[in-house]
A protein has these predicted regions:
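Conserved serine DD-peptidase/penicillin-binding transpeptidase domain
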Residues: 1-173
Length: 173
């Protein structure tokens, strides 16, 4: 089953105009039902090729590309091609920052967190480094020991794949 995107950036978006993804997926499932499709014997594939070229402009700063506002858009976005991570300082300066994926879950991704807890007053200097060429990303930088735990929003280079994954999970439920 191919999900061919048409450039809508609001699928699963937090934006107030967005249709909740469960409601949208129910609508998609009704299309399958009307077509007589009861079971998918294969894969659900998200096709985000609606636009030509890379999803971000080549003049954008590499540090900005990993942030949510640098996610860029493609033909099939999911959650604005962003991803939330829960972050908190480690127990001491120099210790690893505590990082967990919040939403959307991307089980095919491999994440590494070489980021460290920094001295008080140094703020949030976390940056995600990722690429659309392989399912790997690193959160680098530092997070001050005096900062409260927070949700950090970074880019997801696999919006189309994420949309297909969530629709597939919806169909299984």
């Amino acid at each position: 089953l191919y999900i061919v995107g048409g450039g809508d950036p609001t699928i699963a978006s937090k934006d107030s105009i967005a249709i909740p993804h469960a409601k949208l997926f129910a609508q998609w499932k009704s299309f399958l039902d009307k077509a007589g499709i009861k079971k998918i014997n294969g894969k659900v594939i998200g096709d985000g090729r609606y636009f030509d070229g890379p999803i971000e402009h080549d003049t954008w700063s590499y540090q900005d590309i990993g942030t949510a506002y640098g996610a860029g858009g493609n033909g099939l976005c999911f959650y604005e091609n962003a991803q939330d991570f829960r972050v908190s300082a480690g127990p001491s300066v120099g210790s690893p920052v505590n990082v967990t994926v919040s939403f959307p879950n991307t089980p095919w991704m491999r994440y590494e967190y070489p980021c460290r807890t920094a001295p008080a007053g140094t703020g949030d200097q976390l940056y995600l480094f990722n690429s659309e060429f392989l399912p790997y990303a690193e959160i680098r930088g530092s997070f001050a020991i005096d900062r409260k735990p927070k949700t950090e929003e970074f880019s997801n280079k696999f919006g189309a794949y994420t949309c297909a994954h969530y629709f597939c999970e919806y169909l299984k439920s």
